[in-house]
Amino acid sequence: MADYTRQRIFFVDDEVTVRRVVSRTLERLGAKVSCFARARYCLERLRSKRCDLLITDVKMPGMTGIELLTEAKRVAPWLPVLVITGYGDVPMAVRALKAGALDFIEKPLDRKRFLSVVEAALQRSAPIDRLLGKALTRMEIAMLCLLLEGKSNREIAQLLHRSIRTIESHRSRTMRKLGVTNVVDLVRRAAALGLTELPTPQTLKTQR
């Protein structure tokens, strides 16, 4: 069996018994498993923590699994998502695949089939860039705030009391963490992450 000890799985299901059983099953792979009773709780965690695989049920109170899938892809387009659907619910499975799901798993869950699909997804999700999906530092967030305001690297350097080279480094790391290669996609990703209430440069003056 491959080593999955460095990978993180988010599992979402509103039934506590299912969460408990699935968590124990997934932990046998060695991966770190975080379970959520509501899709919105999972989405909140996705905005700040790295996740290598998201597994979600479809029919849940509040935000459904399909809605979570759609929002998760806005936050982390590279994230593989597996959707659990009821037996024979083909239309739902088709919707999930069209929304960006890597695969779907039918209920009732067959342990062998379930683990096989999960392992395939984890192998596929191994990030090429070690920074991809990591949380932004306070300085990177402040830099991003000024960048989104239209400030140049030189202006940002002056406001944050850093060298231009340091700002360029922060900018490069920020784009790598968010999985983007240009400013347009950076703006879109920042909006998807809800980065609207960012700290002002003044709050970071002591972090020099």
Model-derived segments and spans:
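Acidic, metal-coordinating helix/loop segments flanking the phosphotransfer/catalytic sites
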Residues: C35-L53, R74
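C-terminal output helix
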Residues: D89-P91, I105-V118, L159
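Acidic catalytic/metal-coordinating carboxylates
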Residues: A37-R38, T64-E67
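Receiver (REC) domain active-site loop signature in two-component systems and cognate sites
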Residues: M60
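Basic, Lys/Arg-enriched C-terminal extension of HTH/homeodomain DNA-binding domains
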Residues: M175-R208
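Conserved acidic segment of CheY-like receiver
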Residues: D3-V18, V22-L26, L54
